[in-house]
Every structure is written in structure tokens, then in C-alpha cells.
Amino acid sequence: LSFQQVKEKVCKVEAKIGKKLPFC
């Protein structure tokens, strides 16, 4: 996976649990 793909996946999970990571 590219960094961009990983970032997108992580940001989707963070959105579901109501958190926002700095890079999202």
C-alpha cells in the first residue's frame, strides 16, 4: 500500500470513531 492509501484508510476509521488525526 502507498502512504496515501494507508492515510485514507486510517482517516476513514478515525471518522467513524469521531477522532481526527493531524494529517487527516
Curated annotation (Swiss-Prot):
Record's subcellular location: Secreted
Identify the tissues in which this protein is expressed: Expressed by the venom gland.
Q: Which GO terms describe its molecular function?
A: toxin activity
The UniProt keyword set, sorted, is: Amidation, Disulfide bond, Mast cell degranulation, Secreted, Toxin
Tell me which GO cellular component terms the UniProt record holds.
extracellular region
Main site of residence?
Answer: secreted
Instruction: List modified residues, type Cysteine amide.
Output: 24
**What cystine linkages occur within this chain?**
11-24
The entry sums up its family as follows: Belongs to the sylv/frat/paul family.
Q: What job does this protein perform?
A: Wasp venom peptide that acts as a potent mast cell degranulating peptide without hemolytic activity. Shows neuroprotective effect, since it prevents the death of dopaminergic neurons of the brain substantia nigra region and recovers motor deficit in a 6-hydroxydopamine (6-OHDA)-induced murine model of Parkinson disease.
Under what name is this protein listed? Fraternine
Gene source species: Parachartergus fraternus
